[in-house]
Structure formats: C-alpha cells, structure tokens
A protein has these predicted regions:
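N-terminal, positively charged regions that mediate nucleic acid binding
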Residues: 4-16, 20, 28-37
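TOPRIM fold recognition
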Residues: 19-23, 31-172
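Short active-site oxyanion
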Residues: 1-5, 48-51
C-alpha cells in the first residue's frame, strides 16, 4: 500500500492507479480546483503526506504549480507525455503499470530558495537558446524524472531538486 494520498485530475486516473496499486486518491476534477479542494489536500498532507500525480499537459502543470505554491512539502510524480498518451489524448490514465511504478519510485519534493545551478551554467549546458536545447532538456528531464519541461520550468525544477552543473553535465 502507498501510504501517501495521491492527487489526480479525474476518476479515470483514480481507476487506473487503483487497478495496479492499493492507493487512496483525491480528484481535482481538472482545472476546477477550488479553495475547498486545496484545503482537503492540505489536511491530507498533514496527516499522511500527498503525492501530486497529474497529467503531463498544460492544465496538469497549472494544477501542480497552484498546489505546490499553496502547500509546502508535497511530493510530485512525473511521467513524460509520450509515456502517457493515446493517439488523441494525454493523461495518467493512459500510462502503463511500469511507467506509473517508475514515476512513483522517483518522487520530487520542492524546496524553494535553492540555487544549485546558476542561469549561466544552465546556458553553458546548452539547455536554452541552442538548436538542440529541447533534446537536451528532454534528456535531463527523463534522467532525473522531472517530466517534460520548457527551459524556465526545467531550470526551476533542477534547482528545487538540487541538481548541480556537474551532475547535469555527466548526463549530457
């Protein structure tokens, strides 16, 4: 059994996770994330801990940011978009058991005010402003289980996870 309560976007995500794992979930019902739901997540985090396991798309990232900003100490699980999609849809409910297990075994907790990587080092690694920057960002994101990110989000997540220039350079 997974001790923490997992926050997902909808009932199909809950069904998918429960088909493989003994878990309890809180559903945000998509972008309709109200104060009441945030308070439920806050209380759940105080009692048992919470894992945010949201879809690898723009709405999922907005919900993740809003919850992480409102509630310190949440754990985050990420899947890459290509690992959680059908021809027309993207979501946790489309990921395989192996992908879900992998994501849940690499949880990320955000701690603000860290800077293990300067903006200059980020550029020096070629993670922004180069022809192959998107490919390099994907390599880093996949290796450190950060989910698909644009440059700004990757920079923030790398610092929040305390990933150094040396660690990133080794991966690239």
């Amino acid at each position: 059994m997974i001790r923490q309560i997992i926050v997902v976007e909808g009932k199909n995500d809950t069904k998918r996770l429960k088909s493989f794992f003994d878990v309890e979930t809180i559903e945000t019902h998509g972008m309709g994330l109200g104060k009441e739901t945030i308070e439920v997540v806050r209380r759940a985090n105080e009692k048992r801990g919470v894992i945010l396991f949201l879809d690898p798309d723009a709405p999922g990232e907005k919900i993740r940011k809003r919850l992480n900003d409102a509630i310190p100490g949440l754990l985050n699980a990420f899947v890459m978009k290509e690992d959680a999609r059908t021809k027309k849809k993207v979501g946790i409910e489309h990921a395989s058991k192996e992908v879900l297990e992998e994501a849940l075994s690499h949880l990320v907790s955000y701690e603000e005010d860290r800077q293990s990587l300067s903006k200059e080092e980020f550029y020096e690694l070629g993670l922004e402003g180069m022809e192959d920057s998107a490919k390099k960002r994907e390599t880093i994101a996949r290796h450190f289980h950060l989910g698909k990110c644009n440059a700004k989000t990757l920079y923030r997540r790398m610092n929040l996870m305390d990933i150094s220039y040396e660690e990133a350079k080794e991966v690239l």
